[in-house]
Amino acid sequence: MRSDAVKKGVERAPHRSLLYALGLTDEELKRPIIGVANSKNEIIPGHIHLDKIAEAVKAGIRMAGGTPVEFSTIGVCDGIAMGHGGMKYSLGSREVIADSIEIMAMAHGFDGIVLIPNCDKIVPGMLMAAARLDIPAIVVSGGPMLAGICDGTTCDLSTVFEAVGALKAGKITEEEFYSIERNACPTCGSCSGMFTANTMNCLTEALGLGLPGNGTIPAVYSERIRLAKEAGMKIVELVERNITPSQILTKEAFVNAFSLDMALGGSTNTVLHLKAIAHEAGVDIPLEEINDISDRVPNLCKLSPAGKYHIEDLHFAGGVSAVLKELSKAGLLHLDALTVTGRTLGENIKDAKVRNRDVIRTIEDPYSKTGGIAILFGNIAREGAVVKASAVSPEMLRHEGPARVFDSEEEAIEAIYGGKIQKGDVVVIRYEGPKGGPGMREMLSPTSALAGMGLDKDVALITDGRFSGATRGASIGHVSPEAMEGGEIAIIEDGDIIEIDIPARKINVKLSDEEIKKRMANWKRPEPKIKKGYMARYTREVTSGSKGAVFREGGV
C-alpha cells in the first residue's frame, strides 16, 4: 500500500507513534489510509452541512475496511464575494484548494482520497487535485439547495440579484424586494439553479469521478447521506482495484462532460474549469473542439437562469443519468468510458428513464438543436470568448451596437444604475481578466442590473472577466487575450461599433486592421492593481482564460 511509506517497518516507529496518538489501533493501521478532504465552513450555505457528509463518508470507509482521516481546505462563497473586491480572490482560491490537497495527500501517504466540495471553485479545485495526484479518488458533493418560493412562484439567488435592478427601476416595491431577499435561499446546499457549482457537480458524473446522483440529489435529502456512505465504501474498492483518475479522465471523458454541459445549458465557467482539469490530466481540449461539440449536441434542458426549472426538478425528472441516456440515443457519448463505479458510463445509465419531458426534452425535440455554450472568435477575441447561448434571448443572438467602455466592474454598475446605458448599447468591461482584475471577477451584478431594469433583451455585455452561472442575457466573457495582456479589447473606445453573431461564432469591432494596429501601438500596460500578497503572486503566474487560467509551467 502507498501508506506503507508512513507506517511499515522499524524505521517508521516514530510515524506509528504519532498515528497511535490519534487513537488509531493496530488493526486500523493495517487497512488502507483514506484521506477525506472536507471543505466544510460556516460562511458558505453550500458547505455549512458538509460535516454530515464527511461523517457519512467516513462511516462508508470503515464499513468497507478502510481507515478514514479527515482534513480541511478553504472555500469561497461566490455569492457573498460578488460585486466587490472579494471576488478578485475567488478564482485564485481554486489553485490554493488544488495545491493544499496535493500537499496533504503527498505528505501523509494516503492510499486514496474522497473529495467533498459543493460550490463554485471548490469543485474544480478538488477535481484538479484528483487529476494531479492520480491516486484512487472519488468526489461526493454536498448537493443543491431547494428552490425558494417568492410570491407563489419558485425563485433563487439570481432572482435576488435581479430584484436589485428591478427595485431601482421602480418595478417592484420595497416590501416585495425584502420578501424575495428572505425567501430565495431556503436551505443549505449549492444555489438551486444550473449555476456554476451545480453544473460542475453534474459534470462530475459525466467525467466519471462522481457516483450517479452526485449532481442532483438535494442537500437536505437523506438520499445524499446514503450517497456519501456509498462513496466511502467505493473508494476502498477503487484502492483495492488500483483504479486511478488517469484511467478515468481520458479525452473521451472530457468530451462526455462537455456534451452533458451543452445538453444542460450549463455555466460558462465550465469551459475555464474543464480546461484546467484537463490540463492537470494531460488532456488537450482546444476551444474550437468545444464549438464542434456544441454544434452536434442539442440543448435539452432550460434550468434557471435560462428557464423556470431548478436542480430538484432535474432530479425528479431522472437526473444526470437520464440526460446522458437521452444523448446516448444519438450516439453523442463515449459509453465505454470508465467511471468510479468500476463500470462504464454506458453501464451506469442503461436503466435511466426520463420522468418529465418538459424538464428533459427528447433528442428529437430539443430546446435548441445546438448546445448551450458557444465559443466566439474575432478581432477582439483572437483566442476566443465564451457565451451561454441557451440563456440569450433570440433577438440578441445577433446584435450590433455602440460600445460603452468601462475599465472596472464598479464603473459599469454605476453607469447602469445611473441610467447611462441605452437600448442597443454594448457594455464593455475590461481589465477584469485573470491578470488585470486580478482574478477574473464574475460580472453577475452588472448583468443582473441590466436584467432587473429590463435591458437584457436590448443590451449586450462583453468582458475579459467572467460571468456567474446565474447570469442570463447576451453576456460574453473570457475575452482573450485579456486587456492587461495587450488584447484588442484594450483599445476599444466609446462609440466603436461592436458586431456580435452568436450562431456564426463571431465577435468583432468594426475597425480596420490599420486602425487597430495604430491604437495598439499607443497602448500602455497599466500598473497591477494588487502589489502584495497572494493575488500579486497570482497575477505574475496565471495564464490566459483561454487556457483555463491555470498557472504557467514552472510557476508558483
From Swiss-Prot:
Class of the enzyme per the UniProt entry, highest EC level: lyase
Cofactor binding remark: Binds 1 [2Fe-2S] cluster per subunit. This cluster acts as a Lewis acid cofactor.
GO CC annotation terms, alphabetical: cytosol
Positions annotated to bind [2Fe-2S] cluster: C119, C191
GO biological process, one term: isoleucine biosynthetic process
Catalyzed reaction equations: (2R)-2,3-dihydroxy-3-methylbutanoate = 3-methyl-2-oxobutanoate + H2O; (2R,3R)-2,3-dihydroxy-3-methylpentanoate = (S)-3-methyl-2-oxopentanoate + H2O
Names of the cofactor(s): [2Fe-2S] cluster; Mg(2+)
GO molecular function: 2 iron, 2 sulfur cluster binding; dihydroxy-acid dehydratase activity; magnesium ion binding
Binding site residues for Mg(2+): D78, D120, K121, E442
Active site residues according to the UniProt entry: S468
Coiled coil feature spans: none
Pathway, per record: Amino-acid biosynthesis; L-isoleucine biosynthesis; L-isoleucine from 2-oxobutanoate: step 3/4; Amino-acid biosynthesis; L-valine biosynthesis; L-valine from pyruvate: step 3/4
Modified residues (N6-carboxylysine): K121
EC numbers on record: 4.2.1.9
Binding partners and assembly: Homodimer.
Cited function: Functions in the biosynthesis of branched-chain amino acids. Catalyzes the dehydration of (2R,3R)-2,3-dihydroxy-3-methylpentanoate (2,3-dihydroxy-3-methylvalerate) into 2-oxo-3-methylpentanoate (2-oxo-3-methylvalerate) and of (2R)-2,3-dihydroxy-3-methylbutanoate (2,3-dihydroxyisovalerate) into 2-oxo-3-methylbutanoate (2-oxoisovalerate), the penultimate precursor to L-isoleucine and L-valine, respectively.
Protein family: Belongs to the IlvD/Edd family.
Protein name: Dihydroxy-acid dehydratase
Organism this protein belongs to: Caldanaerobacter subterraneus subsp. tengcongensis (strain DSM 15242 / JCM 11007 / NBRC 100824 / MB4) (Thermoanaerobacter tengcongensis)
